[in-house]
Each structure stands twice: as structure tokens, then as C-alpha cells.
Design a protein with these regions (language model features):
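Long, small/polar-residue-biased beta-strand-and-loop interaction regions
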Residues: 2-196
Length: 196
């Protein structure tokens, strides 16, 4: 009888240990599965710029928003409009959240204040991206900072389904509230895309 109870106790201990091991294996595999979604951006997104990833304008000509939204990189003197086209492709099978960032760069001339730089993002059909209004156009200063960095702003946050892609057009111009002066000023930003 004692021998039978000992066997049962051993079986219970063995079953308990097995259940604990299986439980921890399941937790660990679930943890690994969830943390695989934080693959570096270069392994999640493919970014292709139409030309370069830097936009620069000068204080040559302030422009009304209605005209600035139509800028396409052609038909005006250099430095009047800023325009950049890029495509973002999700190379994974999972949904990926991403950010389009604009980093203010030093210029050879005095710098135009962030409060006069209009930024407007559209898709390939020239429709405003989510968060951009047809009636109001934000200035660079008003975009949220990226990681407390006041020179780097989050211009747009989007989501791409697995293997999906999106074309983004970045339009930049000098606000018509700007007062022209004889001093040459400029504003330059680098456009980057990062997975979140």
C-alpha cells in the first residue's frame, strides 16, 4: 500500500513537472513570437526615393497654400518649392506601422524660421494623407518632435499591410505670411522613414 502511494506521488510530481515545463515553453515561444515583430526597419521596409532625400527652399517667394499643395517639383525657379517623392514597401507578411520623419539640417545661409515652412503630404493621386486637412496646412514647427529632438519631426504615421506599398509626395513651401527681406535665408530638411 505504501509502495502504491509512493508510485502515485512520483507520478503526480512527474506530471506536475511536465506541466510546468510545457507551460514555460509555451510562454517562451509566445514571447519570442511577439518580439520578432520588432525587426529593424531595414528588414521590414524598403524605401525608394524618386531623386534625393533632402528638400531645400530659399526665401525667394512666399506662396499661398492653394498653390503650394499643387507643387510637383517642376515649373518654378530653384529654391521656390520643395518637392520629394518616395515609395515605402512593407517586405514582411505582417502589418508594419511606420513614420515619415523630417530632420532640419544646417544651411549655407541664415535659416528660415520653422514657423514659415509649410509641409503637406499626399499620396500618388495627390490626395492628402491621413491627418492632413484640405483647408489647413501645418508648418514644420507644429509637427510632434521625434524622441524629444526638436530638429526632427514626425511628419506622418502610417500602417502598411504585409507586402503592401505606398507612394508619398512631400510638398514644402514658404508661407505667404513670411515677409521678404534682402537677406538670403534657406530651410533644408532630410526625409527619412522608420518602422515603429
Amino acid at each position: 500500500m505504501m509502495h502504491l502511494q509512493s508510485k502515485r506521488a512520483n507520478k503526480l510530481v512527474l506530471i506536475s513537472i511536465t506541466l510546468i515545463v510545457v507551460f514555460f515553453v509555451l510562454i517562451y515561444s509566445n514571447y519570442r513570437k511577439n518580439n520578432n515583430s520588432s525587426i529593424p526597419a531595414k528588414d521590414q521596409l524598403f524605401i525608394k526615393y524618386d531623386d534625393v532625400d533632402i528638400i531645400e527652399i530659399e526665401n525667394k517667394l512666399p506662396v499661398a497654400d492653394a498653390l503650394g499643395k499643387k507643387f510637383n517639383g517642376e515649373g518654378t525657379e530653384d529654391g521656390v518649392q520643395g518637392y520629394l517623392e518616395l515609395s515605402v514597401k512593407n517586405i514582411t507578411n505582417k502589418k508594419v506601422k511606420y513614420e515619415v520623419l523630417g530632420t532640419k539640417l544646417p544651411t549655407d545661409n541664415m535659416q528660415i524660421s520653422d514657423n514659415y515652412i509649410k509641409i503637406y503630404l499626399t499620396n500618388e493621386d495627390n490626395s492628402p494623407l491621413n491627418g492632413f486637412d484640405l483647408n489647413t496646412v501645418p508648418v514644420f514647427h507644429s509637427f510632434p518632435n521625434y524622441n524629444s529632438n526638436t530638429t526632427k519631426k514626425v511628419l506622418y504615421t502610417g500602417v502598411l499591410a504585409g507586402k503592401d506599398s505606398e507612394t508619398i509626395k512631400v510638398h514644402m513651401w514658404l508661407s505667404d505670411n513670411y515677409r521678404i527681406s534682402n537677406v538670403t535665408e534657406a530651410f533644408k530638411i532630410d526625409i527619412d522613414v522608420r518602422a515603429k
